[in-house]
From Swiss-Prot:
Its cofactor is Mg(2+). It is an enzyme of class 3 (hydrolase). This is Ribonuclease 3. Mg(2+) binds at residues 40, 113, 116. The gene is rnc. One of its GO terms (biological process) is rRNA processing. InterPro entries: dsRBD_dom (IPR014720), RNase_III (IPR011907), RNase_III_dom (IPR000999), RNase_III_sf (IPR036389). The keyword Translocase does not apply. Its EC number is 3.1.26.3. It comes from Campylobacter jejuni subsp. jejuni serotype O:6 (strain 81116 / NCTC 11828). Pfam families: dsrm, Ribonucleas_3_3. Signal peptide: none annotated. Residues 154-223 form the DRBM domain. GO terms for molecular function: double-stranded RNA binding; metal ion binding; ribonuclease III activity; rRNA binding. Residues 4-127 form the RNase III domain.
């Protein structure tokens, strides 16, 4: 049995029903009669509302579109995996030996899903306000500067606006290669403008690599 008391201490929440926490920590590969997918579904909805309400009050003058971008920057696999890592959540997840040997304890998708499942479990046992308090504490701890300019790093849109305005061209993003094991896949992206390569970047997803390449291009153009 994993020492889930350590996890409860990190969460600052002690489950009355320990089986509910174990349920939230059980990945589908563990081959039990239950897994955390349904709790993940619930936790995802709770976190979406928690973050939406938080941003609504924190950025009272911002338009709906900006709030949606902010929420998308916080409510995603990468952000939740970061929070999960701060809790050492991978050490507590129940999964098959095969999944663990395949890097399952470090997979952002598994970590993110488990975090959502835990929030869903807290909501079930203690109610929305309790889940909200814990979720916000974790978010603020891991993202101390919740600021639009910091979170919304949409370099692709900014670059496109500049290039279309100045030369009437839209940047193109080409996948040069994908490499590495499945759980640590890397993508190399080349940013092409008017048939010429302007920048190149490597990241763990195509979207992230495209954003990095766009940032490099903006720096070259003196727009950052």
């Amino acid at each position: 049995m994993k020492n889930i008391e350590k996890l409860e201490q990190s969460l600052t929440y002690e489950f009355k029903d320990k089986n509910l926490l174990i349920h939230a920590l059980t990945h589908k590969s563990f081959k039990k009669s239950y897994n955390n997918e349904r709790l993940e579904f619930l936790g995802d909805a709770v976190l979406d509302l928690v973050v939406g309400e938080y941003l609504f009050h924190k950025f009272a003058k911002d338009a709906e579109g900006d709030l949606s971008k902010l929420r998308a920057a916080l409510v995603n696999e990468k952000s939740f995996a970061k929070i999960a890592n701060s809790l050492n959540l991978g050490d507590f997840i129940f999964m098959s030996v095969a999944e663990e040997n395949n890097g399952g304890k470090e997979k952002p998708s598994i970590l993110s899903d488990a975090l959502e499942a835990i929030i869903g479990a807290i909501h079930l046992e203690a109610g929305f306000e309790f889940a909200k308090t814990i979720a916000l504490r974790l978010i603020e701890k891991n993202f101390p500067q919740i600021d639009a300019k910091i979170l919304i790093k949409d370099y692709k849109t900014k670059l496109q606006e500049i290039t279309q305005g100045k030369i009437g061209q839209t940047p193109q993003y080409e996948t040069v290669r994908a490499f590495g094991p499945d759980h640590l896949k890397q993508f190399e992206i080349a940013l092409m403008l008017d048939g010429k390569e302007l920048a190149r970047a490597i990241a763990g997803s195509k979207k992230e690599a495209q954003q990095m390449a766009a940032k490099i291009a903006l720096e070259k153009l003196g727009a950052l």
